[in-house]
């Protein structure tokens, strides 16, 4: 029940914690919690259930271990994405622009307030429905939509000059 959603769980944890190592720790703890509650839990939407556990575990982790800074350049996924853009782009200038745009977007998402960042990651990166997000964070669906709209507006404001 947990394994099919492990990639989404890791992605969410990575966005919430800000780095790969901490995300791995959070996902490991979340998996242990999920397995421990598997026998007693009534699970209607497994993906939302797993991501709720990951979110709560990440929030607990953040409360204890607030990161001092986020270094995006050491992130293997960013480097891989930049390399993929480089390999597929017809010229080096386009590849450089694409890598810079991706880095700027990741930086802008990381700079969002936590409540906004988590809905952007869940919706736009993990592809969760509004209903799944609402269940995962324990908020009404309208609140999810409002937070997402505000988050996107902040991203447009931060990145608008790049367009």
Please report, for each region that a protein language model flagged, where it lies by residue.
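Hydrophobic-face residues of short alpha-helical interaction/recognition segments
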Residues: 9, 13, 50, 54-62
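Arg/Lys-rich amphipathic alpha helix in sigma70-family domain 2
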Residues: 55-74, 90, 98
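Sigma70-family region 2
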Residues: 29-46, 64-66
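Acidic, proline/glycine-rich intrinsically disordered inter-domain spacer in sigma factors
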Residues: 78-110
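Helix-turn-helix DNA-binding module
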Residues: 107-118, 122-143
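DNA-recognition helix of helix-turn-helix
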Residues: 131, 137-161
């Amino acid at each position: 029940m947990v394994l099919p959603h492990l990639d989404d769980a890791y992605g969410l944890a990575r966005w919430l914690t800000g780095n790969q190592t901490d995300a791995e720790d959070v996902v490991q703890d979340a998996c242990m919690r999920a397995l421990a509650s598997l026998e007693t839990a009534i699970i209607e939407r497994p993906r939302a259930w797993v991501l709720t556990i990951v979110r709560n575990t990440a929030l607990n982790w953040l409360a204890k271990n607030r990161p001092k800074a986020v270094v995006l350049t050491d992130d293997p996924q960013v480097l891989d994405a930049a390399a993929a853009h480089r390999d597929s782009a017809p010229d080096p200038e386009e590849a450089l622009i694409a890598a810079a745009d991706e880095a700027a977007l990741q930086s802008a998402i990381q700079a969002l307030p936590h409540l906004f960042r988590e809905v952007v990651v869940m919706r736009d990166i993990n592809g969760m429905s509004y209903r799944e997000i609402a269940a995962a964070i324990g908020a009404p669906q309208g609140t999810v939509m409002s937070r997402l709209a505000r988050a996107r507006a902040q991203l447009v404001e931060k990145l608008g000059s790049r367009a």
